[in-house]
Amino acid sequence: MAEYLASIFGTEKDKVNCSFYFKIGACRHGDRCSRIHNKPTFSQTVLLQNLYVNPQNSAKSADGSHLVANVSDEEMQEHYDNFFEDVFVECEDKYGEIEEMNVCDNLGDHLVGNVYIKFRNEADAEKAANDLNNRWFGGRPVYSELSPVTDFREACCRQYEMGECTRSGFCNFMHLKPISRELRRYLYSRRRRARSRSRSPGRRRGSRSRSRSPGRRGGGRGDGVGGGNYLNNERDNMRGNDRGNDRDRRKGGGGGGGGGGGRY
C-alpha cells in the first residue's frame, strides 16, 4: 500500500495531494483547494509570486477585463529583457549560481508574472527565499517561497510551445515567456567570464549593452515600459560603473543592429 501511495503522489490519481501544486507550484483554487498543498522545506527552486508586470496586460477596463496597451513588440521585448537581466544578475550575484530562471506569461491570477528561479544549491535557494521576502520591487512587496517545481518540462504547456493551446493565457500550465537571443548569449557568456575570473582575479565584469530609445527609460514610472522596476536595495558600485561605461561606449561607437548585435 505504501508503495502504491508513493507511486501516485502528485499525480491525478492522488486524491489527497494537489497534483497542480506539485507540478507547477501554484493552484487556481489557492487555500480553498480540497487537496493538500505540500510546501517543501527544502528545494532548489524559489517562486517569486506575480513579480513580473507585463505592460500589455497591466491596463484594465472598468469591468476588470484586460486591455492591450499601445506597446510595440520591440519595446515589450526590451522591457522584459531588462527585467529578466536585473533579477537574474542580482540574484545570482547575491545568492549563488542559477541553473535556470523562468517567467510565466499566463493571465490567471495564480500564475501571472510568476518568476521561478532554480539555483544550483538548495542552501542558496533557501537563503534567497528568506531574504527576498524582505525586499520590494516596483513599489510592491516581494512574496517568495520555496517551490516544489524542479522539472519545468512537466510544468509547461506543450500545446503552447507548439502554438496550439486553446486556453490562451488562462491555461493552468506554464506559458513561459522567452528572452531574446542576445540576452541569453550574454547571461551564458557572463557565467563563463565569472568562471574565468575565478582563475584570473584581475578581470572585471562586463555588462550587456542595452539599446534604449531616448527618454523611454525615464518616461513612465511604475510598472510600464521603462518604469525602473528594480529590487529595492542599492546596486553594488561595480555594476553601476559598468552600465555607465556601456553608455559611454554606445555614444562613441555608433548605433548597432538589433537582435544578436555585433558585440558577440
UniProtKB/Swiss-Prot annotation:
Subcellular location: Nucleus
Stored Pfam families: RRM_1, zf-CCCH
InterPro entries listed in its UniProt record: Nucleotide-bd_a/b_plait_sf, RBD_domain_sf, RRM_dom, RRM_dom_euk, U2AF_small, Znf_CCCH
A GO MF label: zinc ion binding
Residues carrying Phosphoserine: S19
Region (Disordered): 190-264
SUPFAM superfamilies recorded: RNA-binding domain, RBD (SSF54928)
Domain of life according to the entry: Eukaryota
Gly residues bias (residue ranges): 253-264
GO biological process: mRNA splicing, via spliceosome; regulation of alternative mRNA splicing, via spliceosome; RNA splicing
Domain RRM, chain residue ranges per copy: 44-149
Biased composition range(s): Basic and acidic residues: 233-251
Endpoints of the signal sequence: none
Swiss-Prot/TrEMBL keywords: Metal-binding, mRNA processing, mRNA splicing, Nucleus, Phosphoprotein, Repeat, RNA-binding, Zinc, Zinc-finger
ZnF locations on chain (C3H1-type): 12-40, 151-178
Basic residues biased stretches: 190-219
Main location: nucleus
Reported function: Necessary for the splicing of pre-mRNA. Binds to the polypyrimidine tract of introns early during spliceosome assembly.
Stated family: Belongs to the splicing factor SR family.
Description of how the protein assembles with itself and partners: Associates with a 65 kDa protein.
Entry protein name: Splicing factor U2af 38 kDa subunit
Gene: U2af38
